Amino acid sequence: MNVLNPENKLTLYGQKTPKVVIYKHESHKLHQAFNVKEGETIVQGMAVALHTDGTIKPFTGASGEIYLGIAVTDTKTPAYAGQRAYPVEVTVAVEGYVLCYWAALTAVTPGYVLPTGTLYNNRYPNCANTTGGAESKFIALAGASAPASGVSELIPVLCR
């Protein structure tokens, strides 16, 4: 008995299903939601980069851009629409294997950071931005102001 007839296109009613943007992906990839830079459009399957304010934008390969990963949701049909003064979020399958909370030893901007080898409160690794934005395996996903009276902010850091 033939289960599949090669002459049959398997479309009995309607139209052929259009191809999806993301065909297959590893289910164990790390996903993270990001706010989208105002005025930018992100679509599913698009490569995205970290903007200097911690939001994401389309990756173009321009000098200094920090590639994060591939968008798995989009701004056209977001899972959660922007509400009140809160922007639209897009989920990204990031190029990394873990997200950690590190302490900002100094004022930190979103971008490449390095651990300093010291701990904050005997628990969180301290970090600081790399010199001149040099690439590293660690990316601060949010910024932090300069610590006041020895109290550091915890910031999410993507480790590649």
Whereabouts are the PLM-identified features?
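Glycine-anchored, exposed beta-strand/edge motif detector
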Residues: 1-160
